[in-house]
Each structure stands twice: as C-alpha cells, then as structure tokens.
C-alpha cells in the first residue's frame, strides 16, 4: 500500500474526490478490476473511472489500472484528467504509441492543438509498422492540421 500523502497528491492531479481515493486491500484488487472493467464495457465510464482510480492508488505502477483510468476519463469526456492518466501510461510503457495517440485525442478535444500535434508526432515515431494506428494518426493530422 502506498503512503496516504502520495495518494492525496495523485488524487489532486487527477481531480478525484475523497470518496474516489479511499484505499482498498490487496485481496479486493482483482474483483474491483473486474467490476471496473464491467462498468467500462457497459458504458458507465464515471463508475469505471472511480474504481480504476482506487486501483491506481493501490498499485500506482500498474499500466492496466492507469490505462483503465485514462480510457474511462476520456470516454466520460474528462479530457484533462485523461491526459494526465495517459501521461502516466506513457511513462510506464514508454515504447507504446497508443497512450500518445489517445492523449492527442484528448488535447484536440480541449482545443490544445500544439500539444496534440506533439503527442501525435510521438505516437507516429513509436508506431513502427502498425498500419491501422498510422492511418489514424495521419487522419487526425490531415483533419486538424492540413493547410487548405
């Protein structure tokens, strides 16, 4: 279990309430993850985000928990919190372009085009031969940055 002061810092950055950052025990992690995933799958993104936030505060080094939180926040249109969470995912999984791509989507939703372009370029650099992702990156660049 991580220190409560650190939990509070993470919660503040993500804009979480005290209820969302109540600690859980290690034996609660697996069922809580299944419940969070179920909420996400059913479209209840706010409930999913609340549970993923508790999981993140229990194990801040879990890429799965941060990805779940980032995805839930993004789908709930809490784009700033999603950007912060995608940033942590990119630190924990540094060679994965997906977190950069999703951060770019959030930045575009926040009308932060300069930051979005940086994130798209980072995703492009890491995408390798992932044709589907390359197409998505180029589509966003064409839509948002093409000079007409």
Task: Tell where the protein language model's regions lie, with residue ranges.
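Structural signature of alpha-solenoid helical repeat scaffolds
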Residues: 23-24, 57, 91, 125, ...
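Register position in tetratricopeptide repeats
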Residues: 41, 75, 109, 142-147
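Ankyrin-repeat and related helical/solenoid repeat scaffolds used for protein-protein interactions
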Residues: 87-118
């Amino acid at each position: 279990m991580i220190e409560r002061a650190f939990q509070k810092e993470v919660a503040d950055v993500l804009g979480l309430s005290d209820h969302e950052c109540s600690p859980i025990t290690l034996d609660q992690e697996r069922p809580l993850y299944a419940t969070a995933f179920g909420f996400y799958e059913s479209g209840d993104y706010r409930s999913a985000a609340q549970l993923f936030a508790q999981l993140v505060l229990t194990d801040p080094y879990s890429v799965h928990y941060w990805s779940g939180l980032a995805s839930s926040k993004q789908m709930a249109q809490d784009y700033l919190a999603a950007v912060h969470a995608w940033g942590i995912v990119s630190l924990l999984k540094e060679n994965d372009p997906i977190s950069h791509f999703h951060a770019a989507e959030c930045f575009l939703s926040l009308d932060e085009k300069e930051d979005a372009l940086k994130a798209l370029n980072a995703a492009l650099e890491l995408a390798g031969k992932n044709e589907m992702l390359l197409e998505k990156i180029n589509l966003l660049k064409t839509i948002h940055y093409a000079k007409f």
